[in-house]
Swiss-Prot record:
Keywords: Cytoplasm, Endonuclease, Hydrolase, Magnesium, Metal-binding, mRNA processing, Nuclease, RNA-binding, rRNA processing, rRNA-binding, tRNA processing. The keyword Metal-binding applies. One of its GO terms (biological process) is rRNA processing. GO terms for molecular function: double-stranded RNA binding; metal ion binding; ribonuclease III activity; rRNA binding. The keyword tRNA processing applies. Its cofactor is Mg(2+). This is Ribonuclease 3. GO terms for cellular component: cytoplasm. Pfam families: dsrm, Ribonucleas_3_3. The lineage of its organism: Bacteria, Bacillati, Actinomycetota, Actinomycetes, Mycobacteriales.
Amino acid sequence: MSRRKKRVTGEQALRLEFESVDHQPLIDALGVDIPRELLVLALTHRSFANENGMLPNNERLEFLGDSVLGLSVAGQLYQQYTSSPESDISKMRASIVSRYGLADIAREINLGQHILLGKGEQLHDGRSKDSILADTTEALLGAIYLAHGFEIARDTVLRLFKHKIDTASATGLHQDWKTTLQERLAERNLEMPTYTSTVTGPEHEQTFTAEVAVHGTVLGTGVGTNKKLAEQAAAHKAVGFLQDNPAFV
């Protein structure tokens, strides 16, 4: 007589999926501990929750994290850019906390591999979707706030977003061409860009040249006094290329 295989409950599926990945590198990247229960919740996308018996998902934490993020960035911009009018710092904040800005940070800390997704989202490369990466980043910030309070959550935000905040007024009004390029590529369902750079000249007067490519095709080349500026210039050129070549896929 064959034995009927026991069905895995939603809670069991959640535990198995969560424990299949080592989350310590994520905790290290965030720079702050998160209690296991909150970490599990923050990483549980609604697709996984719905496929496994309507488990709790991270949307409420996302709501909380959005507020923590917005206030933290707004406060820092207010203090750091004392001569900028409200209209300018408002635009800076909007760009920094946008879906694409958040997804940028998520990729820097390799968040995608830690997210608990349903089978459908996994098949559609959900771990690389800007929307899922951004929402999960906010959920993690919400979890940090609940575990440690606003001050620690704010410090985490300012550490993760330091470069974006520090460069927000590089061109008067914030224009992050790398983020804009990611947005344009996502609209066409294209893979994220790759950057390569070279440096020439003496150490005290170096010139950096960067290329940005998609599918092995170079879309733009930029020059700058450091690597970041060169990559921004290359991304700017790539955005122009996409505007001039709407059929590029």
